[in-house]
């Protein structure tokens, strides 16, 4: 065997026929770290690092998929990862992998430069974002998921106490199926505006006073929080379905309070 001979053809084992006749719903690569850029609500771009999962459907008669082509797709991709760009990336993956169905998921930290409510000092706050694109039966669906840290203050504690009320950091997680491109900041603002108070990376004493009093004047159970965010998502025509979660890391318990609302607007009577 002379590998240097230009007439030598290396065997392609993965392209051979598989006799077990068993299709694989999803096969591909996971946990690939690769840089990407996303577009902010102001139209600027933000560089970050994504953790990618890419897979396709494999027919029953095909022994293996083309694993290297998933990474090649990431190397060839460029430009901000908008919803439209994500759909185009999905189509390119299916073409490269010669597949009829597939899925791309990327998770990354996203930073927002926020201004403190009183002092005006600016600081970054990070959010966990996941974009998912899925093609099945000729239908392409795109999802945006964001985890938003906020503050919640207990209405019951406020009502029964002579002074003060227990409060804690909470997580609001919005996983929305998109009908149109929705900036990440839009989902973040919905969650923050419906919480007892939002968070900032840096606060001065006047800001801390504002945050404390703002939360005290706006108490919410985890049920209130998830319902108020859900109303906002229901009113947004760019969102066709969602899974919404709220979790309060209770400061007076060693457990969390949790609520979930799941809704598909297409199934309404």
From Swiss-Prot:
Marked site positions, May be catalytically important: 154
Reactions catalysed according to its record: GTP + H2O = 7,8-dihydroneopterin 3'-triphosphate + formate + H(+)
Catalytic EC class: hydrolase
EC annotation from Swiss-Prot or TrEMBL: 3.5.4.16
GO molecular function, one term: GTP cyclohydrolase I activity
Any Pfam family hit: GCHY-1
Source species, domain of life: Bacteria
Keyword presence, Protease: no
Keywords: Hydrolase
Single GO biological process annotation from the record: tetrahydrofolate biosynthetic process
PANTHER family hit by this protein: GTP CYCLOHYDROLASE MPTA
Family designation: Belongs to the GTP cyclohydrolase IV family.
Function: Converts GTP to 7,8-dihydroneopterin triphosphate.
Record-given protein name: GTP cyclohydrolase FolE2
Organism of this sequence: Burkholderia thailandensis (strain ATCC 700388 / DSM 13276 / CCUG 48851 / CIP 106301 / E264)
